[in-house]
């Protein structure tokens, strides 16, 4: 097979389109796409050909949608390749080692990874970049704006709460009932309004250590210099508020991941300063290893990574100086899947750690409603310690539930973007992820409430 029949805009207008030649053909199996078909064309099993007439309902009109001929066979009848249904790499919610499917199918035809449109429209109208090519080219350092990325960033220690934040928590923790957790644990500036998932950007912005790579955030959620909350503790590298502003010039490149000038980031208007592509790469490069490494001993460190990953991904959705959310929409869907898996891994780690803490309780004081933890097993929070089992359960569960709400917000916004792009199949898959995250929220509430139950079974 050497070409594709294109059905023209006029009835009975059929043209023969040659396949791509040379390097592009070897990479994409002879099919070059720089186009995202509309849902109607997808349902009709239409694919784009090489003429720039364009379907007026498609996202990109650089290519014309037409019937695509399948691989050669004994039959002379043309065959249209069936649509590959959405299928994320791992919907089980557990840590896995499965790799993304190859962009080339057995028939040598370009295939969307997981059913997501992976084609990027090149601004020059030349050759498209598929997901596999993008990751490969970035890993080879072809993009200068990624040279200073710190790969495999790890966070050590426990949550770094400030003294005031801990006082607010601990002053409301004695004899606290699980049902009152959200109402009473986070007080002061971190009030109920901040707990709302829609306040995601304004709450996490002061601690969002990835914002320097992302740039502008939606104007609908302006920054608040007064917002201080326990969730700011997730920036492990900061030991004081002053260290979150400007870093010295000799360490600015390596510490850009940790410290950010947020005012400068929000004032950017030049698309060349956008680092969304780099942020997407960093998340994809690190998140799987964090899923695999989640354990009771590093539960807070992994939770910290999840918060920053969710914040960075959310900012990509709201960035106004680039359209990476459209070009790499499929990757955002994969990130949503991985965020769901990582959330499940964190809850599993919480359950195991809760059991460990329960076993370490000083049973000589078991009659006390505020059972004391073994001093050697107590949790260090900055210069303070969570010294009772109830303190550990309430604080940990509150923070995890709060993070789950932000993860739900990200997946929900990605689903809304899919609907706006007319990617209905992808929106349905994201809706399943959103439901899974909501189930995890319910499980967290139930685990905290069922004090005497077997917490190993989630």
Curated annotation (Swiss-Prot):
Residues 69-109 are annotated as: Disordered. It is found in: Nucleus. Residues 71-100 have a biased composition (Polar residues). Keywords: DNA-binding, Metal-binding, Nucleus, Transcription, Transcription regulation, Zinc. GO terms for cellular component: nucleus. Residues 38-65 bind DNA. Transmembrane segments: none annotated. It comes from the Eukaryota. GO terms for molecular function: DNA binding; DNA-binding transcription factor activity, RNA polymerase II-specific; zinc ion binding. PROSITE patterns: ZN2_CY6_FUNGAL_1, ZN2_CY6_FUNGAL_2. SUPFAM superfamilies: Zn2/Cys6 DNA-binding domain. Transcription factor that specifically regulates the expression of the gene cluster that mediates the biosynthesis of PR-toxin, a bicyclic sesquiterpene belonging to the eremophilane class and acting as a mycotoxin. This is Transcription factor ORF10. It comes from Penicillium roqueforti (strain FM164). The gene is ORF10.
